[in-house]
Curated annotation (Swiss-Prot):
The gene is CAPN2. It comes from Gallus gallus. Belongs to the peptidase C2 family. Its EC number is 3.4.22.53. Ca(2+) 3 binds at G91, D96, E175. Residues 572-605, 602-637, 667-700 form the EF-hand domain. Activated by 200-1000 micromolar concentrations of calcium and inhibited by calpastatin. Ubiquitous. Residues 515-529 are annotated as: Linker. This is Calpain-2 catalytic subunit. Gene3D superfamilies: 2.60.120.380, Cysteine proteinases, EF-hand. Residues 530-700 are annotated as: Domain IV.
């Protein structure tokens, strides 16, 4: 219940603008400005209570309290490590980013790429902080996390051994922005050790909010040059590198002056007419400018004399230091990997870029309710969350005779790094895309059933199911309606996710979910309509007051239930019996009269019939997926979120729902629905309650 309230509050805050980059959400409620003022006024340095400088911040296994790697660690402030510490001195460069005793080279590569773009760097590393002006031992950094920007505060106590920083450090030793950035990112993920192992694209995304894709250049798709051109037109960040096979090859220079294991950026892609044939050229930038390519199409290559003078002048006149052209074929031959970080529209201030259209959807998988696993599990696959996307406009690409809509889908699983210390790790995740058949076109209130997926083949799917934070693929499909089904590979795994769709043209999306409905039979009867035999039975059961209390009801029902061999149950609980009395006690006596007991008896017989019919394996019990069908048979259509709540509330640890819990669930739903319908006299779907009424209803 508390989690639902928190999620609703977060949703409302986001609608008001919280989480956009200009309104980053204070992580763990820590406000940088207020905390710094408080420290300055009190004449003290900040100590972060939410990420204390101690063993837990380092890690849980290899960097745990009993590890030899953490013995002798001392937490020091930069002012204790050198006489004149600087936050950033002379601009952020690669020499500020030297790896320490932590396997987070993926993160450092992303930070290095960040230094290539001052505008984006300034978003992650705010410049309103230093070791001189208003220094209070507190710093802050901003990261994108699953759809929102968060502002993470840290104190400047850093782990050291023998007087030197244990993790990221600058080569020169007196610059600390990169070490503090790493600490803030470690706090966000629970510990330093949680940062071990990852992909550069993960860092790219958390520093920009973009969606990152990568290509192995030895397996480049035939349209990669066109992809690069479009990415540059959209202001994307492009990086490339040459793989190394050993640490000794780091920064090794090839015979044609390319540096291995070094982050380059891609800044241009052009087609030129060279002596009657079209040549594809790509412009690369070595951000530190020491060495440049000496192969074909370098600055001094005679090939340029075979190009139209105006084109040559346009392509070569505004070189930045360290920037060079090379043939695209040479690029594919010499480089190993290309990474493209496609930026969100709000990141790009300039109007000269053709911006992506962005859709973001949050969801979750919950064991027994909405964690159906992949297509290999047809009995449960259909229970996964389903999302409708409408691709309404085709790309504006005159060179493409086929047409279609280009879009990227990225499925990110949330918070998995943080859960490593609890023995959790990344799930294996993926997704499938289905074309909406004509009979379902335009409908968003019908969660597609098992039969649909048994009779319809996926139009597209993720290239693989993989245990990384994100699985991402690029697609091109005709305009139309499609359903995306994200899932874990195996069923019944809990997790939260963020699904993003970047499309060249505007697209719309929505969650596909059943509209909440309740259709149960309400038959008014008079006492005269009740059979004499039932009246006689009631008289024997009710006693002298001619009414049945919840305690008497429990005794009666359990005697009857004990005789049933086809339903396994420990009997009705007193709580269930009280709920049944509450539903049917029209006169407020707290007991059931003849008519009320007759109505209840009819309901229980109906529930028994449903329970037996749904229990196809004749186990005498019902699992959580069968419960979904039982609810429909009883007249209820519920959303996926409600199914999650029902499983959490009424199923046991083996996802079994016995007859008592089945009845309690159905009675509670009927009671709540009737109360709402009574108060919603205008049938608007909304009611207004004050606190006392809210409390009255929620204690039922």
């Amino acid at each position: 219940m508390a989690g639902m309230a928190a999620a609703l509050a977060k949703e409302r805050a986001a609608a008001a603008g919280a989480g956009r980059h200009g309104q980053a959400v204070p992580y763990l409620g820590q406000d940088f400005g207020a905390l710094r003022r408080e420290c300055l006024q009190g004449g003290r340095l900040f100590h972060d209570p939410s990420f204390p400088a101690g063993p837990a911040a380092l890690g849980y296994r290899e960097l745990g309290p009993n590890s030899y790697k953490t013995k002798g660690v001392v937490w020091c402030r930069p002012t204790e490590l050198c006489s004149c510490p600087r936050f950033i001195a002379g601009g952020a460069t690669r020499t500020d980013i030297c790896q320490g005793a932590l396997g987070d080279c993926w993160l450092l590569a992303a930070i290095a790429s960040l230094t290539l773009n001052e505008e984006i760097l300034a978003r992650v590393v705010p410049r309103d902080q230093s070791f001189q002006d208003e220094y209070a031992g507190i710093f802050h950094f901003q990261f994108w996390q699953y759809g929102e920007w968060v502002d993470v505060v840290v104190d400047d106590r850093l782990p050291t051994k023998n007087g030197e920083l244990l993790f990221v450090h600058s080569a020169e030793g007196s610059e600390f922005w990169s070490a503090l950035l790493e600490k803030a990112y470690a706090k966000l993920n629970g510990s330093y050790e949680a940062l071990s192992g990852g992909t550069t694209t993960e860092g790219f995304e958390d520093f920009t909010g973009g969606i990152a894709e990568w290509y192995e250049l030895q397996k480049a798709p035939p349209n990669l040059f066109k992809i690069i051109q479009k990415a540059l037109q959209k202001g994307s960040l492009l990086g490339c590198s040459i793989d190394i096979t050993s640490a000794a090859e780091t920064e090794a220079v090839t015979s044609q002056k390319l540096v291995k294991g070094h982050a380059y950026s891609v800044t241009g892609a052009e087609e030129v007419n060279f002596r009657g044939s079209i040549q594809k050229l790509i412009r690369i930038r070595n951000p530190w400018g020491e060495v440049e390519w000496t192969g074909k199409w370098n600055d001094n290559c005679p090939n340029w004399s075979g190009v139209d003078p105006e084109v040559r002048e346009r392509l070569t006149r505004r070189h930045e230091d360290g920037e060079f052209w090379m043939a695209f074929n040479d690029f594919l031959r010499h480089y190993s990997r290309l990474e493209i970080c496609n930026l969100t529209p709000d990141t790009l201030a300039s109007d000269r870029y053709k911006k992506w259209s962005l859709l973001k959807l949050d969801g979750n998988w919950r064991r027994g309710a909405t964690a159906g696993g992949c297509r290999n599990y047809p009995n449960t696959f259909w229970t996964n969350p389903q999302y409708l996307i409408k691709l309404e406009e085709e790309d504006e690409d005159p060179d493409d005779p086929e047409g279609g809509c280009t879009f990227l889908i990225g499925l990110i699983q949330k918070h998995r790094r943080k859960q490593r210390k609890m023995g959790e790790d990344m799930h294996t995740i993926g997704f499938a895309i289905y074309e909406v058949p004509p009979e379902f076109s335009g409908q968003t209130n019908i969660h597609l059933s098992k039969n649909f997926f048994l009779t319809n083949k996926a139009r597209e799917k993720s290239n693989t199911f993989i245990n990384l934070r994100e699985v991402l693929n690029r697609f091109k499909l005709p305009a139309g309606e499609y359903i995306i089904v994200p899932s874990t590979f195996e069923p019944n795994l809990n997790g939260d996710f963020c699904l993003r769709v970047f499309s060249e043209k505007n697209a719309n999306s929505t969650v596909i979910d059943d509209e909440i409905e309740a259709n149960f039979e309400e038959t008014e009867i008079d006492e005269d309509d009740i059979e004499p035999s039932f009246k006689k039975l009631f008289g024997q059961l009710a006693g002298s007051d001619a009414e049945i209390s919840a305690f008497e009801l429990r005794s009666i029902l359990n005697k009857i239930l004990a005789k049933r061999q086809d339903i396994k149950s420990d009997g009705f609980s007193i709580e269930t019996c009280k709920i049944m009395v509450d539903l049917l006690d029209n006169d407020g006596s707290g007991k059931l009269g003849l008519k009320e007991f007759h109505t209840l008896w009819t309901k229980i017989q109906k529930y028994q019939k449903i329970y037996r019919e749904i229990d196809v394996d004749r186990s005498g019990t019902m699992n959580s997926y069968e419960m979904r069908r039982a609810l429909e048979a009883a007249g209820f259509k519920l959303s996926c979120q409600l199914h999650q709540i029902i499983v959490a509330r009424f199923a046991d640890e083996d996802l079994i729902i016995d007859f008592d819990n089945c009845v309690r669930c159905l009675i509670r739903l009927e009671t709540l629905y009737k109360m709402f319908r009574k108060l919603d006299t205008e049938k608007t779907g909304t009611i207004e309650l004050n606190l006392i009424n809210w409390l009255f209803f929620t204690v039922i």
